[in-house]
Amino acid sequence: MFIDTHAHIPLDIKESFVNNAIKNNVKVIVNQSEDLKTSYDSVDLANTFNEVFACVGVHPENVKEFKESDLPKFRELLMNKKVVAVGEIGLDYYYGKEDKDLQIKVFREFLKLAEMYDKPVVIHSRDAVMDTINILKEYNVKGIIHCFSGSLEVANIYIKMGFYLGIGGVLTFKNSKLYEVVKNISIDNIVLETDSPFLSPEPYRGKPNESKNIPIIGECLSKHLGISLEEVMNKTTSNAKNIYKL
């Protein structure tokens, strides 16, 4: 079976989304959160579907909505048995650095929670590599670098820190720079993700993504690594189970 380590399940199609995944041998979906509301939604989904597990956290684009008074609510959610990680958290300077200090402050709050509850973290990092690395080094956490798109040098830094690299639909894009990275790292350090409903793999690029597309990403990875799809499935599933303690 496959595991989708990173999805945002649309609530209006949740039943068909999960069923489509199961039909395509994607038997576990780890649903991410972007704020307090979606954290509650994610936990509700996990409580509804055996195949779904939840992460809770605040995405860097939503830090202005975060209130410190929300922390007890996140702590309560983290005690739910189906919450397997803190995420999606991190830093995003793509649109500028005007809220950089606030992003870093909120990022640190959730890294502290991850330490406190012994949970892995799911990291969003865009145009913020060095800040992300330096801050992560201050905490005793491991996890997944979501939608990894950096250089081989950066990949090796994260790997040495104990992180897995989340590889998704971008790998299937023509002229993807990820080709050279995945060829030069071990599959022991890779997990598969869709980031549904975003970043659909070819030939569905531009259409809403679903967890059912994980095997397409796996097939692409198997070709680049020169190994069987079954080996990709078994190893990435084992990696996902290891980091999420499934």
Label the predicted regions.
Residues 1-246:
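Mid-domain alpha/beta scaffold segments of enzyme catalytic cores
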